[in-house]
Amino acid sequence: VPLSIRIEGEPLADRGDSELWRHSRLRWLNSTLGISDMPTQPYASMTVSKNEVGCLGRTVSIDEPTGLPGQIEAWNTEILESPVKFIIRTTEGDKELKGSALLTEQTNGHVSRSWKAEDNDLIVTCRSVMEFDGWMNYVYTLTPKKTVEVEDIRLEIPVKAEVGSFFLGAGLLGQETPQQYNGKWDAAERKVEEPGISLATSKEQHGLWPFDSFWIGNAHAGIHCEFRGSTYSGPLLNLYRPAYPESWYNSGKGGFSIRKEAGKVQVTAYSGSRTLEAEKPIHFDFAMIITPVKPIHFDRQFTDRYYHNGPKPTPQAEDLKAGIRIINMHEVNEYNPFINYPSVSYTHLTL
């Protein structure tokens, strides 16, 4: 059907933004802002020097035979007591798979590598990326050449004792790192030999389910680690519960452990026993971010005061006298009446 459209009149200087009923500002949904690979302030461009990859304040030394971090340094503090290990344990013992980490891409915003090794049983590949804010992602693919009986596939992160002072996640509330701990994906296991551990006890009271991630460290250096899957990256809200990544969860066999040993805190994510069938790949996906992600301004802990009142975002005189300097602006109020429709009345935000 032939169709012709004739548009008359002069273009609006503000594209119709002054008339809210047009919802013209929804064009921000098509914005390309933020998808550039250029680091935003205060971040800096990525650096690569031999086996070291760097971002703002942090450096990762790659263990060439495994492609995993051999050492992680945050703001001049070394985090690891020894290299991170991804272990495949069969009935014949731990696999000694060694390859070489190849640089596949380097831009201002990220550095990517690939790694591959194989033996008579398995082909193992890994794709890794580190981004300018210190986020790292490792995706392992295990392809069996034949049926393989596996006792465990696990990730071990050995953190220096002086760094691993505090722990949050994997079923634990924020606390001093316990001497030892054993937890599962969906239900914390309290044991008599684990005194002094603060556990989440109710799915209604705590938004910690599922126990898919943790942070360990102190104010100066630390690691957050998240265990992911091909269609799973952990819910940001507790309104929905996607299926766990079967590689790590393994029908409930997977879990977490903490052990304080001489000079280190060993954090382990294990998946338990399984049968790997020939030519059927399985993926193990995990991400880490090195903390702090930016320089810490400790003085702001004493000078910045926040105000949050969703329906009434205007602080009163007594609030200002108390030192309020920053207002958290929620939606559905006189200044921000529509969710996902940013600052339609920004001229009223001068208090």
Name every feature range the model reports, one short phrase each.
Residues T347-L351:
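Conserved small/polar residues in nucleotide/adenosyl-binding loops
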Residues G9-P281:
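Beta-strand/loop-rich accessory regions of lumenal/periplasmic or secreted enzymes
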Residues P2-R6:
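C-terminal edge beta-strand
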